[in-house]
């Protein structure tokens, strides 16, 4: 998933990776599968983030490897966003502002 306001110039974003709101992925950076880039993080040009890693900061630095709890929590959050998007697209759910 990619949070709103993120700027993406990365060469690769691996499957199941999550990019936080306002994060910047500079030219030729690579984000490994399942990694999490924190909100407002700056991944420098050419930086390679290993799979299953949490990174944060300016410049982004690895904080730790992801835990099973991280993976479960992020999966649930992503699923929630998918449900909310589907709900917004449902014409029966449309309520015009009066």
Question: Which stretches of residues belong to each language-model region?
Answer:
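Structural signal for interior beta-strand "rungs" in well-ordered beta-sheet cores
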Residues: 1-55, 59-62
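C-terminal segments of enzyme domains that contribute to small-molecule binding surfaces
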Residues: 1-2, 6-7, 24, 52-98
């Amino acid at each position: 998933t990619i949070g709103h306001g993120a700027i993406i110039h990365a060469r690769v974003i691996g499957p199941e990776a999550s990019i936080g709101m306002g994060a910047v992925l500079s030219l030729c950076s690579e984000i490994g599968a399942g990694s999490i880039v924190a909100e407002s993080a700056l991944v420098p040009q050419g930086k390679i983030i290993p799979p299953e890693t949490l990174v944060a900061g300016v410049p982004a630095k690895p904080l730790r490897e992801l835990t099973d709890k991280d993976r479960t929590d992020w999966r649930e959050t992503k699923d929630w966003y998918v449900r909310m998007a589907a709900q917004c697209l449902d014409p029966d759910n449309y309520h015009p502002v009066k």
